[in-house]
Amino acid sequence: RISLLDSNGKKTRFLFQVKTALRLDNMLVHHARVESFRPPAPYDAVLSRAFASLADMVAGCRQLLAPRGCFLAMKGAYPAQEIAQLAPVYTVAAVHELSIPDLDEQRRLVELVIRNSGEAP
């Protein structure tokens, strides 16, 4: 299952139309702010598209992630300063360079994991 979350009603209405038109039965669309959203079960992965710094993202989304899950963050240039500001419990598992056709800009996918799921960041 894939859950999509956005606080913008116009975006969630569009996503719901896409879900319906393409008959994507494994997709759920949620209209809510991440800070107040509580899923019925934690997710194996949480993907964010440039809505905050890495530190703010993991702090705001921690309640969504399963103990052995990973955060995936879409970024532009290599976020060295943001990585340095992460709490020590987070490890950068990988930084993937992305190539997007017809886009002459840097894009990266940062993969973060929690070192010890028993520790609270």
Annotate each predicted stretch with a short phrase.
Residues 68-80:
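Conserved beta-strand signature within the Rossmann-like core of class I S-adenosyl-L-methionine
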